[in-house]
């Protein structure tokens, strides 16, 4: 990952140059002037981190910071507003978790950092990473998510939490009820911001933001930076530093991508059954575009005596958690899901992704596929493509400057 071409640019202040920057974004490959301020810190030891946090980082198994960590952590710790763009699986969650933990005053049992994420699972995972990295710091951290008991949230928040990670709706609810006090908050992190700032979450984020102290530092982290994000960052950020992986580096290095041509929708199922033995070599995730399709496919696979588990946003929180737990432990090998799973969930053994349906939005492709080769691990992605999907596939190839070939017969050898 160290070879990733990362460029950075200090915040653009004048309106005309900002407009020019947005216009230039339209080009497939964006070149930025590297800002003088962004230097590369090659090791965790040289970042000026507290001793108890360093212990937690090494105990968690990190040895060397990834490209995004080498550039962003120091800037965030300095107190700068940061827009960080980094490919899925490059360690962006740990980037802001380390930065948040470094900036806490553990003696003060009040919420000092707020991290918003688009899904409950991702918020829960961020909480786990914070607790693991902060293992020697006695850090209090709570995941504030919908679908769980409100009373439990209130009790935890009353006890005092240094960091709250959560989904925007529930976090705003807790602020409104005065259970989550915002007076000591120093930092707001928006994770997977491309999804967060999609229409569904935009209003809720603004609602939360209005309650934060005016000097709050804002960090925004995302795999893709569509224009809407860059326009919005103007509203909540002061002279942000941008740390951007060049667009052509968002190709999915180490992940072999294939397609299987299926003439009709019905043929996808037969193709999947033929591939089942290949799927269970390690672990696989199969993506469908709708909850109904997930339920239908799960039932059909089970009728054909294949063992699969499934997850989507309509399932109760408890059920989703137990399915994830089974999948993480390896007890279940094949998970069928909607895009709720594609956002930042880290299951190291997953080395095969199947897009039963191509994603509706090309920016989701990297979130789905980036899942399978995390931290440089190899992975395989197989896209089922009907005749009328060819155009979408070509569009994805062009957007990510990548190549998707027809699946070879020996695909099992590649996993």
From Swiss-Prot:
GO terms for cellular component: cytoplasm; nuclear speck; nucleus; U2-type catalytic step 1 spliceosome. Its main location: nucleus. Residues 254-415 form the Helicase C-terminal domain. GO terms for molecular function: ATP binding; ATP hydrolysis activity; RNA binding; RNA helicase activity. One of its GO terms (biological process) is nuclear-transcribed mRNA catabolic process, nonsense-mediated decay. It is an enzyme of class 3 (hydrolase). A motif (Q motif) lies at residues 42-70. Belongs to the DEAD box helicase family. eIF4A subfamily. ATP-dependent RNA helicase. Involved in pre-mRNA splicing as component of the spliceosome. Core component of the splicing-dependent multiprotein exon junction complex (EJC) deposited at splice junctions on mRNAs. The EJC is a dynamic structure consisting of core proteins and several peripheral nuclear and cytoplasmic associated factors that join the complex only transiently either during EJC assembly or during subsequent mRNA metabolism. This is Eukaryotic initiation factor 4A-III. It comes from Xenopus tropicalis (Western clawed frog). The gene is eif4a3.
